[in-house]
């Protein structure tokens, strides 16, 4: 075991992620791609970092902002919706900002939307006046209603929001929507977007100034490298000099072409990093424009 891994407990970086749920596996995979590995405790709530002094806490997603605010952990991967909800609640309670979104992590996309019974004829937000809206995000919804100038009642529920209209406890709902299947199953239809959300890496407003600062900087650099390359491919091919400009125009989402040492066949050897989809149709189009020996390679990590 290295000296850095055996560092004192709070010289170690702590990251909270969802124990179960739709963000759990993508979050763990992202951190593993950054070179982190762990030894899990018996209670399966704490994972001790083995490759680096970076530990994991496996918790409920709505606990993550509070753990960051209290200094229990330094970072967390959580939905922007959950982060904004608790930040708004803190602001309404007169508490200072304690955390912020450091960067998006490219998964967990969803929308917080108003949904009404299917029989409603939706005519716009003015229709909400005097209505009861059930939600698990009361602070976000209250802020949104204020911006819209609408006086409506917010009914806070911790779960099963979609059945509130059928139970008579609300007229409509404000809830997260991914595919819309749950709404349709409960005879509801989405009508108004309240916010777009995705998973984010959240951190404390006041960053650590001790040994954790270097760990944080290293982790963020690695994560940027992973995220940049997540949908990228290395494209390699040969081409005659006269075809290079035409090929470059077919690669608007790619880095500048890099010329490799000549292989003795007369053609240029070129490579570039493509940041969009590299489909069969795209390869065939490049071939027609003069590219030869096309190869598409997956790139796992990069330091830029």
Curated annotation (Swiss-Prot):
Q: In which pathway does it act?
A: Amino-acid biosynthesis; L-histidine biosynthesis; L-histidine from 5-phospho-alpha-D-ribose 1-diphosphate: step 1/9
What this protein catalyses is: 1-(5-phospho-beta-D-ribosyl)-ATP + diphosphate = 5-phospho-alpha-D-ribose 1-diphosphate + ATP
Q: Which GO terms describe its cellular component?
A: cytoplasm
Activation and inhibition: Feedback inhibited by histidine.
Its EC number(s): 2.4.2.17
> Transferase as a keyword?
yes
Which GO terms are recorded in the biological process aspect for this UniProt protein? L-histidine biosynthetic process
Task: Kindly indicate whether the keyword Hydrolase belongs to this entry.
Answer: no
* Listed Gene3D superfamilies: 3.30.70.120, Periplasmic binding protein-like II (3.40.190.10)
MF terms (GO), sorted A to Z: ATP binding; ATP phosphoribosyltransferase activity; magnesium ion binding
Top EC group: transferase
Required cofactor names: Mg(2+)
Q: PROSITE patterns given for it?
A: ATP_P_PHORIBOSYLTR (PS01316)
Name the HAMAP family on file: HisG_Long
Family indicated by similarity? Belongs to the ATP phosphoribosyltransferase family. Long subfamily.
Please give the function described in this protein's UniProt entry: Catalyzes the condensation of ATP and 5-phosphoribose 1-diphosphate to form N'-(5'-phosphoribosyl)-ATP (PR-ATP). Has a crucial role in the pathway because the rate of histidine biosynthesis seems to be controlled primarily by regulation of HisG enzymatic activity.
Q: Return the protein name.
A: ATP phosphoribosyltransferase
